[in-house]
């Protein structure tokens, strides 16, 4: 029997929790009802009650009146005070007092810091005739800074170049977003009632009959604005599980079928499922005939991808592939929860995502309760990466890093700058397609611990990013990346120290400031400080952070003319002329471009959240809610789900789903097996940390003190490794060390290593850099391996060897910072 949600609601003492109030006094504390986001980082934004006394945060509790998380909080959020009060916090702006890497700093004022930045741009870029495109801007995974930092890039620095440098193929989330947009026109998420304000009580909602958890551990990751415990509730309501993952997880232990493909081969299972479902006629005929295009073409194409073919590559038994396909297809309501492996565990992320979207479609698992709902940002508040294009200098916008610069065919369809073009031009100083000079003179990064986090090919990234003449880092903490390469560092506020708002799907949420920390500023305040100095004519529009947030909520940060009317705005939906593009459009002279009914303060006083009716509606395609013209159907050129997406051609992607082997696999390069016998799955998640964050929190480290790599008992015995031994993982790119954790749920030829590790308690100055490079799995990964369309990268199926760490071994930090790394043969656009 499933959880009785009404019984839970009836059990809440609403008077004790001050229903209808957003702040009150309780036992000498001021209590504020709000939502938490970054920093410290999180993919989600759960309702919290913040208890403050004498201006300091004293206690954190979950808010049971919050329908998003129902009062549940993860251990990181409960440990928020340790992060807020961490000795690693950056208190003041500081400029470098010694050489890069020495970790010597001199305190300066915010006015001095802003002037230092503005003067550099004016004297070293503008006065020397260089364009603003020579400024690169980056940020981390803080999910509530996806609109502020791109805006800073365009409006303050007037550059259009924002994104990750060594982030080949945007191998996090972007492949799923784009890969789903092609066939579906929008993004699907598993329906666990999260779009409904009344949640599990909604009379329309039903739990999935079959839940596929694919390359994901949602209870640990809670990724992409999706709480994994919602799926746990679905299981309580009877959902059967299919787990597809080489590593045993909570889901695999409870699954009807646990499929264990070789890393990099999952797409074969998706194609084989399509084969079984089409050949055995298990499709939802009514849905396919009414709402899908190119079914006959898909059926003919996947006839070649039999379960036996998939078994020969994945090593998953053919009978299990076929039987699990039938379990999914025969379910009245089937749902597929996908993870990061779709972006970073394949050489063709777009095709794998396409194949899985096709599975959803031909089984009728779109927009039906308990399947997948198509979602937008609440109230059509879409300011994000493409906001940079609204305000960038027109000449800089023309020289934005794009696909054509690296001879990659097809339209650019991502708002960020092309990562591979960015890295290639940084390395060579020229545009590969033309040979034209393109100097990079400045890098501004906000909440982005790049070397410990997302920068692939870590040694390569350090080598070339260190050559950028002027680097500014803004972050709540002093990080190894900051110490390694920054010239100026700026303190950023934690979530509890800022007023802000963010929409990621639904609901729209507000963060209310309850305390301050020395001279730390919020992202909005930093934008205003930079903008008032560097683009004063524009920034007369905003007097304070609340003005800025209100503009985000009500106009989507659109360009406003002297008459107060909106002139340009972010796209919210495609038109016949705009499919396949990511850009900005004329707004038609309207004064409000979103559907948001709240100002920031009104949202705070409403309890901090607001669900929108659009996301809470099922069968949107039948009601004319998906297309900008108001017609029934889907937001695609044909108006139907395109099982073979026509837009893929425009994007430079072959439109039929296929399997592309990773660069080094047992079936394509068997000679590598002896030298590099293991697949290294990098980036396994933990409850205690969010990417590179929380390593300074004593409680989190008590639960998880060291970086761990899981290894099977048989492989550990073969290499003489005991549980707790430190081992090297190594290939020609480099090596890193982690502590062996023997785990029976591992295949013998697979390792599962953790990412994001550094130790704030270790020496900060180079070569140590808090151990950042010593434990870094990205020492082994490669750049310039993007899949079709420039999307996705197979970094989660890297090959390596292992051996024990010995006293006297050269540490990777020293190898990278003093000895030039492991390779001296890098060539732009070559792995």
Per-range role (PLM):
Residues 433, 440, 447-451, 463, ...:
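C-terminal substrate/ligand-recognition segments
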Residues 202, 496-516, 527, 531-533, ...:
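Glycine/threonine-rich phosphate-binding loop and adjacent beta-strand/alpha-helix elements that clamp
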Residues 376-383, 695-698, 705:
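Flexible, small-/acidic-enriched active-site or ligand-binding loops
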Residues 460, 469-470, 475-477, 512-535, ...:
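Phosphate/diphosphate-binding loops
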Residues 2-497, 534, 622-624, 631-633, ...:
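Catalytic alpha/large subunits of respiratory electron-transfer oxidoreductases
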Residues 1-15, 346, 524-596, 600-601, ...:
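Long, contiguous, secondary-structure-rich segments that constitute the structural scaffold
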């Amino acid at each position: 029997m499933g959880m009785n949600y009404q019984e839970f609601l009836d059990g809440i003492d609403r008077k004790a929790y001050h229903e209808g109030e957003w702040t009150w006094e309780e036992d000498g504390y001021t209590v504020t009802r709000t939502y938490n986001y970054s920093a410290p980082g999180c993919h989600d934004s759960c309702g919290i009650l913040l208890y403050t006394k004498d201006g300091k945060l004293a206690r954190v509790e979950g808010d049971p009146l919050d329908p998003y998380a129902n009062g549940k909080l993860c251990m990181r959020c409960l440990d928020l005070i340790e992060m807020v009060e961490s000795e690693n916090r950056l208190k003041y702006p500081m400029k470098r007092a010694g050489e890069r890497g020495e970790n010597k700093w001199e305190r300066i004022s915010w006015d001095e810091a802003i002037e230092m930045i503005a003067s550099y741009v004016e004297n070293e870029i503008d006065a020397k005739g260089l364009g603003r495109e020579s400024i690169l801007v980056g940020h981390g995974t803080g999910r509530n800074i996806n609109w502020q930092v791109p805006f800073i890039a365009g409006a303050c620095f007037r550059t259009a170049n924002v994104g990750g440098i060594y982030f080949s193929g945007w191998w996090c989330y972007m492949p799923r977003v784009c890969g789903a947009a092609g066939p579906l026109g929008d993004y699907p998420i598993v329906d666990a009632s999260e779009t409904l304000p009344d949640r599990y009580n909604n009379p329309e909602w039903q739990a999935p009959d079959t839940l596929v958890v694919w390359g994901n551990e949602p209870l640990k990751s809670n990724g992409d604005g999706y709480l994994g415990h919602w799926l746990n509730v679905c299981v309580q309501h009877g959902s059967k599980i299919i787990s597809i993952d080489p590593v045993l997880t909570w889901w695999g232990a409870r699954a009807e079928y646990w499929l264990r493909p070789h890393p990099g081969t999952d797409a074969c299972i998706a194609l084989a499922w399509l084969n079984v479902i089409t050949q055995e006629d298990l499709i939802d005929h009514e849905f396919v005939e009414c709402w899908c295009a190119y079914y006959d073409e898909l059926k003919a194409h996947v006839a070649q991808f039999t379960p036996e073919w998939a078994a020969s590559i994945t090593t998953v038994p053919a009978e299990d592939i076929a039987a699990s396909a039938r379990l999914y297809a025969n379910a009245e309501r089937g749902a597929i929860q996908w993870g990061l492996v779709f972006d970073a565990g394949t050489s063709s992320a777009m095709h794998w995502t396409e194949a899985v979207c096709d599975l959803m479609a031909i089984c009728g698992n779109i927009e039906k309760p308990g399947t997948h709902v198509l979602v937008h940002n609440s109230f059509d508040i879409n300011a994000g990466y493409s906001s940079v294009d609204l305000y960038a200098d027109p000449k800089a916008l023309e020289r934005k890093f794009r696909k054509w610069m690296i001879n990659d065919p097809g339209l650019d369809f991502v708002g960020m700058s092309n990562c591979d073009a960015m890295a290639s031009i940084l390395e060579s100083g020229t545009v590969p397609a033309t040979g034209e000079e393109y100097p990079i003179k400045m890098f501004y990064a906000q909440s982005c611990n790049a070397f410990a986090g997302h920068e692939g090919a870590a040694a390569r990234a350090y080598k070339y990013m260190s050559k950028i003449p002027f680097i500014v880092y803004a972050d709540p903490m002093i990080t190894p990346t900051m110490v390694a390469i920054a010239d100026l560092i700026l303190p950023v506020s934690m979530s509890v120290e800022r007023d802000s708002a963010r929409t990621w799907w639904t609901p729209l949420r507000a963060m209310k400031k309850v305390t301050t920390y020395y001279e730390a500023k919020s992202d909005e305040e930093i934008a205003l400080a930079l903008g008032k100095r560097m683009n004063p004519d524009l920034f007369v529009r905003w007097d304070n952070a609340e003005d800025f947030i209100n503009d985000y909520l009500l106009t989507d940060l659109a360009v406003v003319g002297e008459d107060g009317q909106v002139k340009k705005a972010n796209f919210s939906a495609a038109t016949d002329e705009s499919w396949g593009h990511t850009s900005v459009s004329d707004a038609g002279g309207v004064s409000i471009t979103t559907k948001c009914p709240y100002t920031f303060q009104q949202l705070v006083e409403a309890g901090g959240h607001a669900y929108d009716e659009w996301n809470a509606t099922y069968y949107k395609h039948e009601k004319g809610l998906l297309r900008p013209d108001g017609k029934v159907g889907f937001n695609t050129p044909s108006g139907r789900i395109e099982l073979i997406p026509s837009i893929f051609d425009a994007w430079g992607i072959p439109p039929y789903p296929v399997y592309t082997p990773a660069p080094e696999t047992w079936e394509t390069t068997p000679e590598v097996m002896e030298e590099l016998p293991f697949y290294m799955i990098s980036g396994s998640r933990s409850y205690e940390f969010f990417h590179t964050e929380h390593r300074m929190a004593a409680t989190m480290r008590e639960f998880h003190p060291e970086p761990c790599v899981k290894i099977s008992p048989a492989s550990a015995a073969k290499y003489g490794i005991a549980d707790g031994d430190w081992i090297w993982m190594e290939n020609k790119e480099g090596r890193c060390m982690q502590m062996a954790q023997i785990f029976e749920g591992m295949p013998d030829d697979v390792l599962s290593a953790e990412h994001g590790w550094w130790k704030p308690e270790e020496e900060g100055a180079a070569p140590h850099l808090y151990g950042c490079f010593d434990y870094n799995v990205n020492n082994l990964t490669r750049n310039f391996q993007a899949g079709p369309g420039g999307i996705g990268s197979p970094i989660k199926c890297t090959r390596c060897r292992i051996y024990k760490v010995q006293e006297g071994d050269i540490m990777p930090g020293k190898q990278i910072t003093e000895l030039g790394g492991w390779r001296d043969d890098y060539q732009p656009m070559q792995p």
